Amino acid sequence: MKDRVLLLGVLILLTACPIGAASVSAKGMEAFEGVCSRADEYGCYVNHRYGYALAWPKRMLRPLGESDAGDGQVFASPDGRAELRCWGSFNETPQQTIPEALAQALAEPGRQVTYRHAAKDFFVLSGYETDRIFYRRSILAHGVLATFELTYEMSLKELFDPVIRDISAGFIIDPAFGLR
């Protein structure tokens, strides 16, 4: 009986954490913990369904609650001048790549993209949408595509530029956070 329980436990661990995807890089976790350790500035949201985590500026934004689907959260400024959204999804087609996800994001209407950068496992877009600035970062890891997007009025650019760096540095996917 003990052998069966042990075997079942090993099978569950192997299924939940495939070899090569056991954890986020130490550098990524260190960056996340570094931002989240600044508790007077940042709150840390962890999405247990998709296993991603995001630091959010708690002096500027308030959480509005996780979506009914459990895929993400919205944080908004009390005056409505800024909003941070994050969401995740399982990569149901393992062939989907960052270039494909980037093309899909670029196809969204009404946006003027002024900056884009793509690498093997992430992309960044920023630009303008009507009278607002947007910054989107998507990461692909462990079979999950996670995205955050910060939008804010142009007059808030100086305030939010350093915040974007912190949010980006601490945005990670790690099976230790959930992946249900």
At which residue positions do the language-model features occur?
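N-terminal low-complexity, Pro/Thr/Ser-rich intrinsically disordered segments
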Residues: V24-C44
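Secretory pathway targeting signatures of secreted, lumenal, and periplasmic proteins
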Residues: V46-T97, L125-Y128
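Extracytoplasmic/secreted envelope proteins and their assembly/folding machinery
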Residues: P57, Q95, P99, D161-S168
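Signature of long, low-cysteine stretches enriched in small and polar/charged residues
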Residues: P99-L159, G178
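Short, exposed beta-strand/loop patches in secreted or surface proteins that constitute
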Residues: G34-S37, Y45, R62-E66, R111-H117, ...
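Bacterial N-terminal signal peptides that target proteins for export
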Residues: M1-L7
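Short, low-complexity, Pro/Ser/Thr/Gly-rich segments in the mature regions of secreted, periplasmic
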Residues: F171-L179
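Bacterial N-terminal signal peptides
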Residues: L8-P18
